[in-house]
Amino acid sequence: MRILKKKMKLKGKVKKYLIDKLNDNEKLHFSLIDPFKINSSDELKYITKNLYNAGTDAFLIGGTLGVSKDKLDFVISLLDDYEIPKIIFPSNINLLSEKADALLFMSLLNSDDIYYIIGAQIVAAPIIKMLQMEVIPTAYVIVGHGGTAAHIGKARVIPYDNFELATAYTLAAEYLGMSFVYLEAGSGAPEPIRPEMISFIKNASSIPLIVGGGIRSVEVALKLVEAGADIIVTGNIIESDVNKAIKIIRGIKNK
């Protein structure tokens, strides 16, 4: 069991924290917390304590629908004692908070709407500067099912079996200077991204891969890690069965 420590000063150091872990050949796990789906502070404390003790490397905070600034700040404040990063996973510019340690500064590369590729980022940039937030440049690419994120973001989703197209997007992100590529099958996706796609991409690109959506078992998570995923994200399973989420985290961290 991890011991709860005094909060580390992570602001301005989150990207380095993650890259250092990856350079030490660690595989990482992010726990995605959707403030809209949290029913009480007691529920959140119970869930996050178990995720932290299992070894999750960071908390992602965000959701596609129904998240207010007040709810976002409230959730981040309840996570304040944990010495792992609290990173905002934004769906729009309303999800910004100086209380977080960092922000995934994302561009939805396969959107048909320029707003989600660069428009929202332009509007948000002065606010981020004012709040003095650390940004982690991240290419967001939606694959397969896509779910609500694909619908809202007007994404031209990449088919599960089109490995070449997914690789082309990943290489484009790498050449643009992004720090990470986040491959997303969508919240609650019936099928996760295929390990074969991950290994195909990894044969062509060296950029760290974040993979999420439809990951409901430790077996699936480990296949993705073995294929080359650097960071696994779980969200829905945390809400529906925290014990399964714990098994996934322990499987990844004990790999």
Swiss-Prot record:
UniProt binding sites for sn-glycerol 1-phosphate: Y182, L183, E184, A185, G186, S187, G188, G213, G214, G235, N236
- Spell out the subcellular localization from the entry: Cytoplasm
The answer to keyword Transferase applying to this record is yes
Give any Gene Ontology cellular component. cytoplasm
Cited Pfam families: PcrB
Give the enzyme's main class according to its UniProt record, as a single word. transferase
Q: Which domain of life is it from?
A: Archaea
What are the recorded Gene Ontology BP terms?
Answer: glycerophospholipid biosynthetic process
Q: SUPFAM superfamilies, alphabetically?
A: FMN-linked oxidoreductases (SSF51395)
Q: Which cofactor does it need?
A: Mg(2+)
Question: Keyword annotations for this protein?
Answer: Cytoplasm, Lipid biosynthesis, Lipid metabolism, Magnesium, Metal-binding, Phospholipid biosynthesis, Phospholipid metabolism, Transferase
UniProt-listed Gene3D superfamilies: FMN-linked oxidoreductases (3.20.20.390)
Q: Does the keyword Lipid biosynthesis apply?
A: yes
Q: Where does Mg(2+) bind?
A: D34, T64
EC number(s) reported in the record: 2.5.1.41
Reactions mediated catalytically: sn-glycerol 1-phosphate + (2E,6E,10E)-geranylgeranyl diphosphate = sn-3-O-(geranylgeranyl)glycerol 1-phosphate + diphosphate
Annotated family:
Belongs to the GGGP/HepGP synthase family. Group II subfamily.
**What exactly does this protein do?**
Prenyltransferase that catalyzes the transfer of the geranylgeranyl moiety of geranylgeranyl diphosphate (GGPP) to the C3 hydroxyl of sn-glycerol-1-phosphate (G1P). This reaction is the first ether-bond-formation step in the biosynthesis of archaeal membrane lipids.
- Matching PANTHER family: HEPTAPRENYLGLYCERYL PHOSPHATE SYNTHASE (PTHR40029:SF2), PTHR40029
The name under which this protein is listed is Geranylgeranylglyceryl phosphate synthase
Q: Which organism is it from?
A: Saccharolobus solfataricus (strain ATCC 35092 / DSM 1617 / JCM 11322 / P2)
